[in-house]
Amino acid sequence: MTLSSEREAAKAAFLSANGFGDVRRESLGGDASTRAYERLHRGEQSYIFMDQPPSLETAPCPPDASPAERAALGYNALARLAAGRVDAFVACAGWLNAQGLSAPKVLAADPAAGLAVLEDLGDDLYARLIEAGTDEAPLYDAAIDGLLAIHAAPTPKVLRYDGSTWPLLTYDDLALKTAHDIFVEWQPRFRDISFDAAALAEWEAIWAPIRAKGEADATVFCHRDYHAENLIWLPERDGAARVGMLDFQDAVLAHPAWDLSMLLHDARRTVSPEREAACLDRYLAARPELDRTAFLAGYHALGALNIIRILGIFARLVTRDGKPRYADFIPRLWVYLDVCFADPALAELKAWFDRYVPVETRR
C-alpha cells in the first residue's frame, strides 16, 4: 500500500468512525501549507474536512525551549509557529467560539492523525466579495468588532477544548527578531543590494527597543493571519459573529496592534488610507482607556515590522521557491511602509532604509 493509499484509508476510517461515512466528498485543494481540504455533502448539509498529514512540517516551538534550542529546532520554533498541528486549530477554535465568535465549530477531530471535520462557514471570503463589488465598509467594521471582542477577553496561557490542549505562547523578542530579520536575509537575493556589518548593527539597534515594547505589551490573543482572505462574511449572524475566522492555528499572545496591521496592511489587496483611518478610529473609540498617540506609535512600529517580515517572506518565495507571482504584491507593501514611516517615532528606521535600501529597489 502506498503512502497516499494509506492516507486515504485512514481518512475513510476516520469519517466512518465519526458518523460521516455516507458523505459525498469534494476536493477543495490546499492552502499555502501542507493542509488540504474537502467539502463533505450530505443532503442539504455540508461540512469541511481538514487533512493535515503528520510529520510533513517540523515540530512546533516547545513552550520552555531556550533561544539556542529554538534555533536548533528551526524556523517554526524561532517564529513560534504551530507547524500545522490540528490540536492547535481545535484549541484555538474552541476558545474563539467560547467568546461568541465564528470560528468553524469542530465536529470531529483526531489531532494525532491530523484530521478534523469542521463547520462549513461557506465561500464568502472578504477578498472575494470586495473584488466583486460588495461595500467593504460593513465588512471592515465587523472585522474591527471581532478584534475588539478578542482583545476584551481574558486570555489564558493554555487553551483547552474537547481534549485538545495548546499553549498560547508569547510573540517574544526572538520571534519578533526572526520576523524582521527575514528581510535582511532575503531582500539582497531578490534585489541587488547588500548589508554590511555596520548596517546590520544599526538594524539591530533600531529594532531592539521596538521588540522590547512589543513583547511587554503582548497581552491579547493574536490570530496572526487576520486579513481578507481568511475572513468570511456571515451577515445572518449578529455583531462580531458576522466575521467567520479561518487559519488561526498559529495564534500567540501579542500586542493588539499586530492583527490590526495584518488586516489593514493587507499584502494581497489595497486597503485605502481612508479605510485604514476609519478602522483605527473605530477601534480606538471603543477603547477610550488607550492613549491614542502611544497606541498609534505601536501600531506603526509593529506594522512596519510586519510589513518588513512579509517583504522578506515574499522575496524568499520568489528567489528560493520559484514563485514569481508573489513579486506582484511587493509594491503595495512599500506603499504601506511609507505610511508607517511618516510617524516621527520611526525616523531612525526610515533613515536606515534611505541609507541602505535605494528607492529604485523598493518595487
Curated annotation (Swiss-Prot):
The EC number(s) given in the record are 2.7.1.221
Q: Which UniProt keywords apply?
A: ATP-binding, Carbohydrate metabolism, Cell shape, Cell wall biogenesis/degradation, Kinase, Nucleotide-binding, Peptidoglycan synthesis, Transferase
A biological process from GO = peptidoglycan biosynthetic process
Pathway, per UniProt?
Cell wall biogenesis; peptidoglycan recycling
Q: Which InterPro entries match?
A: Aminoglycoside_PTrfase, Kinase-like_dom_sf
**Pfam families per record:** APH (PF01636)
Enumerate the GO terms in the molecular function aspect.
ATP binding; kinase activity
Signal sequence residues: none
Q: Does the keyword Oxidoreductase apply?
A: no
User: Out of the domains of life, which is the source?
Assistant: Bacteria
Instruction: Name the reaction it catalyses.
Output: N-acetyl-D-muramate + ATP = N-acetyl-alpha-D-muramate 1-phosphate + ADP + H(+); N-acetyl-D-glucosamine + ATP = N-acetyl-alpha-D-glucosamine 1-phosphate + ADP + H(+)
Describe the family membership recorded for this protein in Swiss-Prot or TrEMBL: Belongs to the kinase AmgK family.
Function recorded in the entry = Sugar kinase that catalyzes the ATP-dependent phosphorylation of N-acetylmuramate (MurNAc) and N-acetylglucosamine (GlcNAc) at its C1 hydroxyl group, leading to MurNAc alpha-1P and GlcNAc alpha-1P, respectively. Is likely involved in peptidoglycan recycling as part of a cell wall recycling pathway that bypasses de novo biosynthesis of the peptidoglycan precursor UDP-MurNAc. Is able to complement the fosfomycin sensitivity phenotype of a P.putida mutant lacking amgK.
Q: What is this protein called?
A: N-acetylmuramate/N-acetylglucosamine kinase
This chain's source organism reads Caulobacter vibrioides (strain ATCC 19089 / CIP 103742 / CB 15) (Caulobacter crescentus)
